[in-house]
Amino acid sequence: MDKKQLLRNLPKIDELLKEEIVNRYLQENSRTLVVDSLRQSIDHYRGEILKNNIDSFTKENVVNYFIDTLEENKSTKFKKVINATGVVIHTNLGRSLLAKEAIENVVKISENYSNLEYDLKEGKRGSRYSHVEELIKKVTGAEAAMVVNNNAAAVMLALNTLCEEREAIVSRGQLVEIGGSFRVPDVMKFSRAHLVEVGTTNRTHLYDYENNINENTGVLLKVHTSNFKIMGFTEEVSSEEMVQLGGKYKLPVMEDIGSGTLVDFSKYGFTYEPTVQSSLEKGVDVVTFSGDKMLGGPQAGIIVGKKKYIDKMKKNQLTRALRIDKMTLAALEGTLKCYIDEKEAIENIPTLNMILSSKDIHKKRAQRLKRRLQNNVKDFNFKVSEDLSMVGGGSMPGERIPTYVVKVNSDKITAEKIEEKLRLSKNPIIVRVSKDEVILDVRTLFERDFNIIVEEFKKLLK
C-alpha cells in the first residue's frame, strides 16, 4: 500500500472513541486524557508512515498503542529506578538515598503544619535555620551554621557576603568544574566577587597568594578538588598556612570542600578526604559543602564557620532566593541526628553503609541473586565475579571499592539489548555493560530489588 493511502487510512479520533475498549477507558479516565492519548497514537503511526517504517497497520494496532500511551501518561514521569551500576552516589539517579529517620521526618513535616518559621517557646516568628543549626554545630564543632538549597548556592552566597566587588584569591589548580558545565569561576562571577588566579595548574605556593594580596582583597579561597586528582610534580598550600596568611592580613579564609564528609574514611582503609571538622579545627573561617553526597542526606548547601560571617550571610538578600524548603530541612535534620553517633550513622545512612560494607557480605548477596535468576530465568548465563564499585557524585576520585557482581549474557539477545529493555521496563533497572555482558553490582541493590530483577529478566525474551 502506498504512503498516501496509508495516511488516508489513519482513523479519526471520533471514530476511535466509538470503539468499545476505548469507551471503557473513557469511563475510567478524563476525556482530555483519553483524547490526548488517542491523538498521540495516531501521530505515532503518521510519523512511522512518513518515515517509511511501516507498510501496513490495523485499527487494533492504533488502539493498542493508545492503551500503552494512556498508561504512560497516567504514570508519573519521576520514577523509582533500581541502581545496579555499583555507583553509590549516582548523580543521574538522585545521588544519596535517605536514611529511614530522614524519610520519617519528611513525612511527618510534609503532611502536617509545622513550626517552620515559628518560635513555639516565644509565640512569635522564628528562623527556619534554627531547626538544624544546633545539630550542625554539634556534629561539626562550628561556631555557627546555615543551610541553602545546594553547594553552588552556598559558595555564591558566601563569596557575595565576604567579597562583593572585591577580589577572591584562588589557586589556578582549584578552578574546578562541578558537573553540568557549572564551574567555580562562573559561580564566582555571579557572586560579584572578582577572581584572582594564582600559581599554576600543578603547583601553587604560599607566596603566590601573598604576592597578590592588596587593599581590594576580600577573601582567600581554597577549593577541594573532590572530583579529580593531580598526580606527580605538585604543590598546594595547606589550610593551616592559608589561615596564618589570612590572620596576618586580617582576611577571612574560605574553603569549599564539596562532597563534605563528616566521617574520616581513612580509618576504614580509604584514601584520606578532608572532613568538615578538620577544616574547622585548622581555623578556616567559612566552610561550604553538599548535603547529598558523602553526608548522605538531601540536596543542600551547608555553610559552617565563624559566627560573625554566618550572621552576615543570614542577612544577605540572596539568602531568601536560595533558602531551603521545609521538606529538605526535615530530611537534613533526620540525617544529622544519625551523626551524633558515628557507628549509628554508618549503620543507618544508606550512602555510608553501601560504601563501607564489606566485600564478603556482597559475595553472599551476589550468590543469592544468581541462584534466584538461575532458578527462574531460562536462556541466560549467570555467574558471580569480583569487580569494583565506585563512590560517585564527584567524590573520592580514583577510589574503587572491591565488590561482587552477577554477570549476565545470552545467545539469544545482546547485552546492549538487555540493558535497553531493563532500562525501559515497567520497573527501570540501570545496569553496566562490559564485553557483551550485563553487570549487576549488588553493592547498590537492596534485597527488595532481587524479586523485581528476576521478574523483569523473565520478560526479556517475550
Swiss-Prot record:
<dbReference type="InterPro" id="IPR004534">
    <property type="entry name" value="SelA_trans"/>
</dbReference>
<dbReference type="Pfam" id="PF12390">
    <property type="entry name" value="Se-cys_synth_N"/>
</dbReference>
<keyword id="KW-0711">Selenium</keyword>
<protein>
    <recommendedName>
        <fullName>L-seryl-tRNA(Sec) selenium transferase</fullName>
        <ecNumber>2.9.1.1</ecNumber>
    </recommendedName>
</protein>
<dbReference type="InterPro" id="IPR025862">
    <property type="entry name" value="SelA_trans_N_dom"/>
</dbReference>
<dbReference type="InterPro" id="IPR015421">
    <property type="entry name" value="PyrdxlP-dep_Trfase_major"/>
</dbReference>
<dbReference type="GO" id="GO:0001717">
    <property type="term" value="P:conversion of seryl-tRNAsec to selenocys-tRNAsec"/>
</dbReference>
<keyword id="KW-0648">Protein biosynthesis</keyword>
<comment type="similarity">
    <text>Belongs to the SelA family.</text>
</comment>
<dbReference type="GO" id="GO:0005737">
    <property type="term" value="C:cytoplasm"/>
</dbReference>
<keyword id="KW-0963">Cytoplasm</keyword>
<dbReference type="Pfam" id="PF03841">
    <property type="entry name" value="SelA"/>
</dbReference>
<comment type="pathway">
    <text>Aminoacyl-tRNA biosynthesis; selenocysteinyl-tRNA(Sec) biosynthesis; selenocysteinyl-tRNA(Sec) from L-seryl-tRNA(Sec) (bacterial route): step 1/1.</text>
</comment>
<keyword id="KW-0663">Pyridoxal phosphate</keyword>
<dbReference type="GO" id="GO:0001514">
    <property type="term" value="P:selenocysteine incorporation"/>
</dbReference>
<comment type="function">
    <text>Converts seryl-tRNA(Sec) to selenocysteinyl-tRNA(Sec) required for selenoprotein biosynthesis.</text>
</comment>
<dbReference type="InterPro" id="IPR018319">
    <property type="entry name" value="SelA-like"/>
</dbReference>
<dbReference type="GO" id="GO:0004125">
    <property type="term" value="F:L-seryl-tRNA(Sec) selenium transferase activity"/>
</dbReference>
<feature type="modified residue" description="N6-(pyridoxal phosphate)lysine">
    <location>
        <position position="293"/>
    </location>
</feature>
<dbReference type="InterPro" id="IPR015424">
    <property type="entry name" value="PyrdxlP-dep_Trfase"/>
</dbReference>
<keyword id="KW-0808">Transferase</keyword>
